C-alpha cells in the first residue's frame, strides 16, 4: 500500500458519520415543481435536479473523483419512500445501538418543519400500508416474515457495465434519442434520456472543479493529477474510455449518480475482472507503470467504503455494520465454459490485500477448472482474516440458474449482488431480499396451537408445520407483490433501467417488467434450529416418552425456569444429535423442510411476470428474528439468536469438525436455493499458518467445490482478540470481520452481533 492510499484510508474514517439532508431537500424542491406530471418523469427530473445542484468535491490526494456527499461516509435520506421512520428516529441516530449518525438540531428542525409535512401521505410507504391486509400486517408485526425494501429505491442489481464502458455516454445518449424519436410518447425513454444527459453534465461539473482546484494548487504533482482528472472527466462525459484510469473513473461516476437516483443498497460491481481487463491491458500496452495501475485500483477499493446506508434502527439490526453491497466476483467461467481467471483477477486480490476494508465485498468463483496459483492467492487473501473473499461454486450455481430458465451462456456469466444473492449481470431484476421468512417462528405457532391435543403424533405435527409454512408463504408473497407494485407506481428508476437488458427493447422500466429475467428473492431463516428442535422433540416426546407434549410445552413456556427445566434443557441439547454433524436423521429433516419451503416459494409469480426464488441467508437477521421466538426444543432460550448464516449449524452444535459440517450442508439441495445461500466457517489463525496452512486451505476449497455446496465464507480470528476489541475498541478500529455475507468493522457492530461472532465454533484443518 502506497503512502497515498494509507492517507486516503485514514482520512475516510477520521470524522464522525453525519446525516446529510442535501439529497432530500433537492429532490423535494424539484418534486414541488412537477405536480401532475407522470411519476417516471417526476423522478427523472428530481434526480437531474440533484445532479445539477448537489455540492461536489474532490478530496486531497484522490485519483478517482466522485463523492456522494462532501463529508465522508455521510448518510442521505429518501423521504419520498418512507418519511415516517425518519421522523420517529431523528433524536435516536447519535445514540442507537447500531449504525450511529450525528445530526444537527437545525437539520432536525428542517426535517420536521419542511420535509416531513410535504411527504406525509405522499410516499411509497403510504401506498404500501394502504394496500397491506390486516393478516399480512399481523404476520409482519410478529416477525413471522418481514417485508423489506419499503424505505429506499431499487438496488440489489448489477448494471451492464460493459455497455457503459464499451459505448460511452455520448453513444448511449444518441441511441436513446433514436428511441425517443421512434416512440415520442414513451415516458420511459424520455426519462432515461433526460438522466443520461444529466449524467454527462454532472461529470463535466467535476471537470470544471478539478480545473479550478488545479489553478489554485501550489503542488506541481497534485496540479498535474487534478488536470488529468479534468481531462478524463471531459473525455468520459462524451466518449468511451480508452485507459484503465478512464474506465475506473467512469465506472465510479455512474455508481455515484445511480446512488442519487435511488439511494439504494447493493449497486453491485459484477464481474469486475472481466469487463475491466481490456482497459487494464490497454494501459499496460501504452506503457503505464503497473504499480500505478495497482494504486488506481486501491484508490477505487477505498472509495467503495465512502458510501454507507442510513437505515432505521430495526433495519440496522437486520443489516448491521453497513453492508453496502459493493460485491464483485472474480474468476469463474467464460460463456463457452473455459476458465475466466486472468491477470486482473490476481490484481483485484492484491489490491484488496493492501487496503483490507469491508468493501468491496469480493468473492471468488470456483470450479473444476480453477488453477492452483489463483486458488493459492485466494487462500492467501482469506488468511488475512477480514472474511474476504467469499467463495461461490460454479458447479452448483450454473445448474441452479438453468433450472430457472436462464440460458447457459447467461448462467455462466452469473455474479452476486448484496451479500450472496445470485444474479445475471445487466439482465436481471431479482428484487433480492424482498422478504425474510422465520421458519422457527412458524414451528412455535404450531406447537402452541397443539396444546392439549392428546392425539398429536410427530407425523401430524410435521404435516401441520408444512401447511403453516405454505400458508404464511402465501401471505409473504402477497406483501412482497404489494411492495413490488409500490416501486413500479411510485419509484421507477429509468437511469438504472437503461443499463439492464431488455428494458430499451421493451421501452419499460425494470420495475415494470423491463428486465430479461424477473425474480423476487426471499430468504428462509432458521432451518438448523427447526430441524434440531423437531429431532429432539420427536425423541423426547414421541419415541422415548420422557415427557408428554404438554409437559415439554410448559417447560418451553417457562423458558426452562421450572424445577426440572435445566435437566430437560441439558437432555435436549446433549442427548439428541444436531444438524451440522453429518447425522442423516437430523440432516434429512433440514433437507425435507427446506425443500418444502423452496417448492412452495417457487410456485408464485410476481407482477413483472417472473417467479419467486428461494434462498437461505440471514445477513444479521438471525439475531432480531430469534428475539421474537420463545424457548424451543433444541435447548435454545427464549429470545436467543437463531443459527447464523443461513445453512450454518447453531452456535456450538457442530461438534464433529468441519468435514461433518460440509457433509450436512451437502445433503440439502443447494441448486434449489437460486436466490443464494450462506455458510459461515471460523478458523483459528494457527491452523492456516505457513505454506502448509495455505495448501490445506486450497485443498479444502477444492473439496468444497466437489461436494457441490453453493457458498462458503470464513472468519480467521481468535475469540480472545475479539474480546479484547470489545474492551478496547479504540485499539482495534481497523479490525474487519465477517458477519454474514459481508464484512464489517468489528467495533462498529452492536454487542449482540459481536457476541454472535465470538461464539461461533472455531475449526482447524
Describe each region flagged by the PLM.
Residues 190-201:
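Extended non-globular scaffold/tether segments
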Residues 2-189, 225-228, 232-765:
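Conserved catalytic cores of very large enzyme subunits
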Residues 214-221:
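A conserved hydrophobic secondary-structure block that centers on an alpha-helix together
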Residues 203-211, 273-277:
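Extended amphipathic alpha-helical scaffold segments
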Amino acid at each position: 500500500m502506497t503512502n497515498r492510499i494509507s492517507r486516503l484510508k485514514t482520512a475516510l474514517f477520521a470524522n464522525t458519520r453525519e446525516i446529510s439532508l442535501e439529497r432530500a431537500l433537492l429532490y423535494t424542491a424539484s418534486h414541488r415543481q412537477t405536480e401532475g406530471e407522470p411519476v417516471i418523469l417526476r423522478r427523472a427530473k428530481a434526480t437531474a435536479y440533484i445532479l445539477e445542484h448537489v455540492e461536489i468535491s474532490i478530496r486531497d490526494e484522490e485519483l478517482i473523483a466522485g463523492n456522494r456527499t462532501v463529508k465522508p461516509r455521510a448518510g442521505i435520506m429518501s423521504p419520498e419512500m418512507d418519511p415516517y421512520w425518519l421522523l420517529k428516529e431523528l433524536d435516536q441516530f447519535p445514540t442507537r445501538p447500531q449504525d450511529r449518525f450525528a445530526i444537527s438540531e437545525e437539520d432536525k428542525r428542517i426535517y420536521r418543519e419542511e420535509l416531513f409535512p410535504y411527504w406525509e401521505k405522499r410516499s411509497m410507504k403510504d401506498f404500501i400500508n394502504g394496500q397491506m391486509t390486516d393478516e399480512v400486517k399481523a404476520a409482519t408485526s410478529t416477525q413471522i416474515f418481514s417485508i423489506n425494501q419499503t424505505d429506499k429505491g431499487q438496488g440489489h442489481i448489477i448494471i451492464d457495465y460493459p455497455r457503459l464502458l464499451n459505448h460511452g455516454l455520448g453513444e448511449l445518449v444518441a441511441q436513446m434519442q433514436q428511441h425517443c424519436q421512434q416512440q415520442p410518447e414513451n415516458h420511459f425513454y424520455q426519462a432515461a434520456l433526460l438522466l443520461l444527459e444529466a449524467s454527462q453534465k454532472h461529470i463535466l461539473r467535476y471537470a470544471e472543479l478539478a480545473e479550478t482546484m488545479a489553478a489554485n494548487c501550489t503542488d506541481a504533482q497534485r496540479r498535474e493529477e487534478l488536470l488529468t482528472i479534468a481531462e478524463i472527466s471531459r473525455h468520459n462525459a462524451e466518449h468511451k474510455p480508452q485507459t484503465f484510469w478512464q474506465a475506473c473513473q467512469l465506472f465510479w461516476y455512474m455508481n455515484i449518480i445511480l446512488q442519487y437516483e435511488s439511494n439504494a443498497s447493493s449497486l453491485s460491481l459484477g464481474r469486475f475482472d472481466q469487463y475491466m481487463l481490456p482497459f487494464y491491458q490497454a494501459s499496460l500496452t501504452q506503457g503505464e507503470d503497473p504499480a500505478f495501475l495497482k494504486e488506481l485500483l486501491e484508490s477505487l477499493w477505498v472509495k467503495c467504503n465512502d458510501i454507507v446506508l442510513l437505515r432505521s434502527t430495526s433495519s440496522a439490526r437486520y443489516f448491521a455494520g453497513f453492508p453496502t453491497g459493493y460485491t464483485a466476483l472474480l474468476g469463474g467461467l467464460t460463456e463457452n465454459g473455459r476458465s475466466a481467471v486472468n491477470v486482473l483477477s490476481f490484481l483485484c486480490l492484491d489490491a484488496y490485500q493492501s487496503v483490507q476494508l469491508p468493501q468491496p465485498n469480493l468473492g471468488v468463483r470456483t470450479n473444476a477448472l480453477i488453477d492452483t496459483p489463483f486458488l493459492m492467492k485466494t487462500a492467501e487473501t482469506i488468511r488475512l482474516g477480514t472474511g474476504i473473499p467469499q467463495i461461490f461454486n460454479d458447479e452448483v450455481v450454473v445448474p441452479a440458474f438453468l433450472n430457472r430458465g436462464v440460458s447457459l451462456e447467461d448462467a455462466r456469466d452469473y455474479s452476486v449482488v448484496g451479500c450472496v444473492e445470485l444474479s445475471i449481470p445487466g439482465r436481471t431484476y431479482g428484487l433480492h431480499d424482498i422478504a425474510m421468512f422465520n421458519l422457527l417462528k412458524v414451528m412455535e405457532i404450531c406447537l402452541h396451537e397443539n396444546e392439549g391435543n392428546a392425539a398429536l403424533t410427530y407425523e401430524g405435527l410435521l404435516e401441520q408445520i408444512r401447511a403453516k409454512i405454505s400458508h404464511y408463504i402465501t401471505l409473504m408473497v402477497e406483501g412482497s407483490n404489494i411492495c413490488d407494485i409500490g416501486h413500479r407506481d411510485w419509484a421507477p428508476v429509468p437511469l438504472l433501467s437503461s443499463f439492464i437488458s431488455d428494458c430499451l427493447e421493451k421501452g419499460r422500466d425494470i420495475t415494470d417488467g423491463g428486465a430479461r429475467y424477473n425474480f423476487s428473492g426471499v430468504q428462509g431463516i432458521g432451518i438448523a434450529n427447526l430441524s434440531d428442535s423437531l429431532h429432539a422433540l420427536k425423541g423426547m416426546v414421541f419415541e422415548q416418552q420422557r415427557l408428554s407434549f404438554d409437559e415439554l410445552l410448559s417447560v418451553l413456556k417457562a423458558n426452562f425456569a421450572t424445577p426440572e427445566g435445566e435437566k430437560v434443557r441439558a437432555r435436549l441439547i446433549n442427548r439428541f444429535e444436531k444438524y451440522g454433524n453429518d447425522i442423516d436423521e437430523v440432516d434429512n429433516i433440514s433437507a425435507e423442510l427446506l425443500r418444502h419451503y423452496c417448492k412452495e416459494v417457487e410456485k408464485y409469480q410476481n407482477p413483472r411476470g417472473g417467479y419467486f426464488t428461494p434462498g437461505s441467508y440471514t445477513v444479521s437477521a438471525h439475531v432480531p428474528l430469534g428475539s421474537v421466538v420463545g424457548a424451543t426444543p433444541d435447548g435454545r432460550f427464549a429470545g436467543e439468536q437463531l443459527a447464523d448464516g443461513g445453512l450454518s449449524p447453531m452456535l456450538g452444535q457442530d461438534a464433529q469438525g468441519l468435514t461433518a459440517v460440509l457433509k450436512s450442508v451437502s445433503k440439502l439441495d443447494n441448486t434449489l436455493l437460486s436466490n443464494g445461500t450462506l455458510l459461515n466457517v471460523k478458523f483459528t489463525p494457527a491452523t492456516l499458518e505457513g505454506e502448509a496452512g495455505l495448501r490445506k486451505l486450497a485443498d479444502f476449497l477444492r473439496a468444497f467445490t466437489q461436494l457441490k455446496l453453493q457458498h462458503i465464507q470464513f472468519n480467521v480470528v481468535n475469540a480472545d482478540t475479539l474480546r479484547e476489541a470489545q474492551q478496547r475498541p479504540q485499539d482495534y478500529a481497523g479490525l474487519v470481520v465477517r458477519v454474514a455475507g459481508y464484512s464489517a468493522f468489528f467495533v462498529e457492530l452492536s454487542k449482540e452481533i459481536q457476541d454472535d461472532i465470538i461464539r461461533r465454533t472455531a475449526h482447524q484443518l
